[in-house]
Structures are given as structure tokens and as C-alpha cells.
Amino acid sequence: MRNRFGCLFSLTTWGESHGPSIGLVIDGCPAGLPLSLEDFVPVMLRRSPGRLGTSQRKEADIVHILSGVYQGKTTGTPIALQIFNTDIDSETYRKQDDRYRPGHGQFAYEKKYGIVDPLGGGRSSARETACRVAAGVVAAKLLAHYDIYCLAFLSKLGKESIKEYPQFTHEFAQSVYSSPFLSPLASDTITKQLMDLQKEKDSLGGVVSFITSPIHESLGEPIFYKVQAVLASALMSIPAAKGFEIGLGFASADKYGSEYIDPFIFEEGKISMSSNNCGGSLGGITMGMPLNGRVAFKPTSSIKQPRLTVMKTGEPTVYSTPKEGRHDPCVAIRAVGVVEAMVNLVLADLLLQQRCSRL
């Protein structure tokens, strides 16, 4: 089983949903980067459960630095971080351990490995993404040193979506971070949809978009490691992710070449483009434009309606999520921080690779 992501700036995560703790090791972070416990607090809060539209499992998600930092700066050695699980309720899973949970990876996991930890989803639980968000904090600090910034936000919930694609500004980022749903969509509209979901005992899918500041570093390679290829791999590894696109994405298929091509222009002493249909990547390499893309998330499989399934012995039966079960009615809300983290991790890794690509 592979638990490592990245090449030069790499992340390894460990732990299960209902284990004592989860954690991660970052390898390849340069020495001298300022890093403190306070850096993690606001970012971890944006992913944390316990609010409307998210799981009612209340985890503090306090990050503990075990190694790799001395006197407030990274030392260049592996950075080990640990997050304790403090709000675990395994009994609801043990009660129905004799049957498979519809829509979850438990059956496939057990078929592949012959053994599975079913409590809270075990290793395949979205709980693991807290580690990615913590790692994203370190990656974001490295990128900020090179004036590269990324923002993710909820751009579509069910049939409600943003009308225009925004540009990255720090002011827009602050407005997203101050929203309870990390979205430019109207909070009262989202609240109504989520309240309706609770009444209907159902769940809803969504889309998380990301935008970056202009990236003047040449990140990515022209063949197998195009920036969009690495982003796709990273973002599609997030639990419940079902689709990825960059720039116009699938809408590109509806365009004529004369409509799609981004014209080059010379502006303020440098070559740029007058549009960004490509999403910030030409030939798989960034070239001064902002990156932008979207990730589609399926509706959460854990809904409080009875669903058809089978016993582990093969007999037909029903799986019912207990009333006390704690699950996200819309996983896309908490996925916002995970998308932002994974984009930051990809860009940090490609940035270090770019430093090695030429004299």
C-alpha cells in the first residue's frame, strides 16, 4: 500500500479514523522556513467538522510538531506532525459489521487486502485528510516565499453555482475564509439547502474550485509530469472526488479553435495572454498566468435512509445508518481545505524540481 505523495517535497501519512492518532512526515522541506504551531490553527479550523453541513464529530485537530523544527524554523530534516483523535464512537460501526456499507470502499479494500479496519472507514476515511491539510500549511509557507498563493472555495452546491470565475486576490481570499461555508455563494442559500437535506435524510454533491496568483516559475514538465497531470493525480486522490478539470476543462470540447486559443500580448514589459482558457498551463508548464481548476465531489454515501446491501455471507439485507451516526451531508464543504492543501503540495514539489532543471 502506498502512503507517500510527492518527489522532492514529499508527504507520508499514517493512522486510522478511530485509532489513537493520525500523523504525517514531510521530507524535503528546505531549512530556514519559519514554522510554528500557530500557523496550523486557522487552516485546521477551516477543515474541522462540527458545523452545519459537516460531520458532527468534534475533533480539535491540534497539530503537534515532533521533529524537523528548531527555534521556530525548519531544519531541513523530516518534519513529523501528529494529530490525536479525541472524539471516537466505534459502536455504531460494530453493530453492523456483518454487512457491507453501500457506496463505501470497505468491500473493495477487504477484497484486495483480505483484512480491513471498518471503524469509521479506517485508513480510507476522510479523517486522513487532516494530515494533508496540515502538510499544506508547510507547503503554503514555502510557496509564499516565492510569492505564489492558492485559494480553494466551494463554487457549486447541488444546482447552485457561482456565475463568474474570480481572480485571486488576498481580499477575495479573506472573504472566502470568513464565510462559514468557505464559499462566495450566499450563506443563506447554502443554509437552506443543508437544512432541507437534514429533513430528507439525504446528501448532496458539490464542486470545489481553486485559483492561484500568477505563477512566473516554470512549473511542470512537457510529457508525463505536466502540471495538470500532477494536479489531477493529487486532487483525484481525495476521498469522494469524482472529476477534475483545468481552465475551460470539458467546456473546451464545445469551442472552435478561434474561440479557445489564448492570444499572446506584450504588456507592462513582459509577454502575457489576453485570456486564460488554458487554465494557466501551456504544454504542461506554467508560464506566468494564474492556475485555475475544479474538482467535483459525489454526495456522501452515509445517508440516514435504509439502503440495499448484502451480508458478508452474501444474503440480501439492508444497511441503516444509525440516528447517532455522524457524517457529512455535503463532503465538498470540508473538502475545500483539502483541495487547497493538495494544490499547495503539488506546487511546492514542482517548485523544488524546477530549481534542479537548469543551470
Curated annotation (Swiss-Prot):
Binding site for NADP(+): 47
One GO-annotated biological process of the protein: aromatic amino acid family biosynthetic process
EC numbers on record: 4.2.3.5
A GO MF term: FMN binding
SUPFAM superfamilies, sorted: Chorismate synthase, AroC
Subunit architecture: Homotetramer.
Gene: aroC
Species name: Chlamydia felis (strain Fe/C-56)
Binding site for FMN: 123-125, 283, 298-302, 326
Pfam families cross-referenced by the UniProt entry: Chorismate_synt
InterPro entries recorded: Chorismate_synth, Chorismate_synth_AroC_sf, Chorismate_synthase_CS
Catalytic activity: 5-O-(1-carboxyvinyl)-3-phosphoshikimate = chorismate + phosphate
Name this polypeptide is given: Chorismate synthase
Cofactor: FMNH2
Key word NADP present: yes
Keywords: Amino-acid biosynthesis, Aromatic amino acid biosynthesis, FAD, Flavoprotein, FMN, Lyase, NADP
